[in-house]
């Protein structure tokens, strides 16, 4: 994989980075066998030699296996792949067989013989006296140079170096974006037109979009609420949205976000991809094909958030090609006040836009975000925690009052949704506008021992409401298992895109969802298989080799995790394909 990175078109800086990074990490990889062999020398010279030969061969074998996995799937050895390789039958399910096992064993033995040969050659041939001072100095310079090069490339969005870093096994990046901004430097946001080197490890989309000659261009409005879980959508808590869904839209009762946090939830909604792709798309400043198609058609943009577009970095991913002047953030005051102002701004945008052009609207609401603020007129649960102080609260005792705050905040959110929907009705926009109303992720209140989100894949953290309305959509209730990953294929199909969804997404249009499907959700460092019977959380970072978590679909424990993993092998191999299809070399 390093060879491939060196052969890609790039720059002197990417070559420098890769060389110094490989030197530094080679030392890191040699440390375990070096330390173990030194300890073994306490029992004699030959035990030390044996550990040195075996340890070096095993480490080299691990790196070669990691390189092969990276070439095939676009990511390094992690807990997910490790489990498939070590579970009985797992290697076969990935396409391996007896011949492959035999070849692997022969290759491992050959490495041991090779390392033993190097050892005996070095023992028979005088070795020059090592200048340890110079070696340590050179090693430190390599490590500092590699980290400085990566940090600078990350801040300047210099893709050749960022792409090269993915070739280094188990690479741990260092960034200094916050420190640079504190000194007055501004990070690079916009991306230039991608060339072959910039595309790096992405193969997205797999086929260029084909659009029907008579493709419609309806208005699109995407309304997403922070931390909104599915059971808030009731006639009591959210009467406006409930009534709107009853009269005009489809209410999806079994809908999962693609993440347990904002970053992966929004990413999955716009891209139709699981969150393990986030980092590569961020490095490449690659927007989703949905936004590229909308911009190609000249849609007018009304984009508002009560948080920030820069964190998570949606200005460098979802909206990477949108001029910064069109990204409107409001960070003043509590979330409910920001939501009110942004609804006002969205209504003003609808009044002032060029009516001859279709529009794309996006509004991100903050009302349900912890600490769940709301005005007095939004109180429907009066028994709420009045003084919400993280330092003094007793979580076990106060969780009921905290949940009631959340309910009141969700009710305020509904009031703002009602204002916007009524405003669109007054402007005669509901009949020709596709509306998507959902949450970025859910929120847990100790139902399974956690509070908040971003920690587990419990239903309370990933189960969100979804209402879809627009031209040709009749009121209905859908109980099939749907996902945020299905929204991009749904919208693109309604825009007249003729490609199969697998050309650009992992999800499927909402009206084509099978009953027995699995869904995917992601966190910063894991992807979860969410099946009809079981859940499996799989670490995607290289360091999490043994951190698999298996439960039933209702989040209760299973008795035999290994048996469940063996039963799910074929499905998990499919997941592996989903996680690698849009990397170079993916299938």
Language model features with spans:
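Transmembrane and membrane-interface helices of multi-pass
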Residues: 1-171
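Membrane-interface soluble catalytic domains
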Residues: 41-48, 116-124, 130-159, 309, ...
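Active-site-proximal alpha/beta segments of enzymes that process anionic O-linked groups
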Residues: 138-390
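A long, amphipathic alpha-helix that forms part
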Residues: 170, 343-351, 386-433, 586
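Short beta-strand segments
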Residues: 224, 256, 303-305, 360-367, ...
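Histidine-centered active-site microenvironments of extracellular/periplasmic hydrolases
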Residues: 425-472
């Amino acid at each position: 994989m390093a060879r491939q990175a060196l052969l890609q078109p790039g720059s002197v800086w990417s070559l420098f980075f890769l060389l110094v990074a490989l030197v530094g990490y080679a030392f890191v990889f040699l440390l375990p066998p070096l330390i173990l062999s030194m300890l073994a020398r306490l029992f004699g010279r030959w035990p030390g030699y044996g550990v040195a030969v075996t340890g070096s061969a095993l480490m080299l074998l691990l790196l070669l296996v990691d390189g092969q996995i990276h070439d095939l799937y676009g990511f390094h050895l992690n807990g997910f792949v490790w489990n498939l390789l070590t579970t009985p039958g797992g290697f076969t399910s990935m396409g391996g067989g007896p011949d492959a096992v035999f070849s692997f064993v022969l290759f491992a033995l050959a490495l041991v013989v090779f390392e033993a040969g190097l050892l005996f050659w070095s023992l028979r041939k005088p070795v020059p006296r090592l200048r340890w001072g110079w070696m340590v100095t050179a090693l430190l310079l390599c490590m500092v140079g590699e980290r400085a090069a990566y940090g600078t490339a990350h801040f300047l969005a210099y893709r050749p170096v960022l792409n090269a870093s993915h070739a280094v096994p188990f690479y741990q990046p260092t960034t200094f974006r916050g420190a640079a901004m504190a000194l007055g430097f501004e990070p690079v946001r916009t991306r230039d037109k991608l060339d072959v080197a910039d595309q790096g490890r992405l193969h997205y989309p797999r086929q260029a979009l084909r659009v029907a000659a008579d493709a419609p261009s309806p208005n699109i409005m995407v309304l997403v609420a922070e931390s909104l879980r599915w059971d808030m959508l009731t006639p009591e808590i959210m009467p406006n949205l409930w009534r709107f869904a009853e009269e005009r839209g489809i209410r999806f009762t079994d809908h999962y976000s693609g993440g347990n946090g904002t970053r992966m939830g929004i990413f999955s909604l716009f891209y139709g991809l699981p969150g393990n792709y986030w980092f590569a798309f961020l490095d490449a400043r690659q927007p989703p094909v949905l936004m590229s198609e909308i911009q190609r058609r000249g849609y007018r943009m009304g984009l508002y958030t009560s948080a920030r577009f820069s964190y998570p970095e949606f200005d460098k991913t979802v909206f990477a090609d949108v001029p910064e002047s069109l990204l409107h953030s409001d960070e003043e005051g509590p979330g409910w006040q920001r939501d009110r102002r942004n609804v006002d701004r969205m209504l003003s945008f609808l009044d002032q836009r060029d009516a001859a052009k279709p529009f794309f609207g996006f509004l991100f609401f903050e009302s349900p975000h912890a600490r769940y603020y709301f005005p007095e007129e939004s109180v429907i649960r009066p028994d709420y925690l009045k003084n919400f102080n993280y330092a003094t609260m007793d979580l076990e005792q106060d969780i009921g009052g905290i949940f009631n705050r959340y309910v009141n905040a969700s009710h305020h959110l509904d009031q703002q949704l009602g204002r916007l929907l009524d405003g669109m009705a007054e402007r005669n926009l509901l009949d020709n506008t596709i509306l998507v109303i959902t949450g970025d992720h859910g929120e847990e209140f100790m139902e399974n021992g956690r509070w908040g989100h971003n920690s587990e894949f419990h239903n309370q953290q990933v189960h969100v409401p979804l209402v879809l309305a627009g031209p040709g959509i009749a009121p209905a209730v859908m109980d099939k298992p749907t996902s945020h990953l299905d929204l991009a294929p749904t919208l693109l199909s309604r825009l007249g895109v003729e490609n199969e969804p697998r050309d650009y997404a992992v999800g499927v249009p909402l009206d084509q969802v099978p009953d027995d499907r699995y869904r995917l959700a992601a966190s910063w460092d894991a992807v979860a298989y969410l099946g009809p019977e079981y859940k499996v959380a799989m670490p995607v970072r290289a360091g999490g080799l043994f951190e698999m978590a298996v439960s039933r679909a209702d989040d209760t424990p299973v008795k035999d995790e290994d048996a469940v993993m063996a039963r799910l092998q074929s499905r998990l191999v499919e997941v592996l394909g989903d996680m690698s299809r849009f990397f170079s070399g993916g299938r």
